[in-house]
Amino acid sequence: MRKLKNILITGGAGFIGCNFIHYLFGLSNSGTDLFGDANFTGNVVNVDCLTYAGNLENLKDVENRDNYTFVKANICDKAAIDKIFAENDIDRVVHFAAESHVDRSIKNPEVFVETNVLGTLVMLNAAKAAWELPDGTFKEGKKFFNSKEI
């Protein structure tokens, strides 16, 4: 497996996202078998729109790291997400951003569909655009995969 260089984490100010960021930077030992290296040396770009579940206070201990960047953006904003991919040479995405409180989904289901479905589609399309070559192959380190093989 290729070493992670520039990882985009969506929803990184939420409970799961901020704990994952702490894990990557070696500030937590839970789940060390996931990536094998709890002292991640690549760059983390944390994208969160800071709704009711996002709290940057949970990331005070990483906010001044040279390899950490926070971007306040909504995952449904195609232009913002495309810009983040282009400016940061993203090679991996961990997508935690979501509307998750069931009681809120009853009052306003449209927001849930927009974020959880359309926002995920924006992320997938941005990754595809960033990683797909003109001939239909996808870049992965020094290897190239044809979309028909995947």
Segments the model singles out, each with a brief description of its role:
Residues 1-150:
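N-terminal Rossmann-like NAD(P)+-binding domain of SDR-like oxidoreductases, especially those catalyzing
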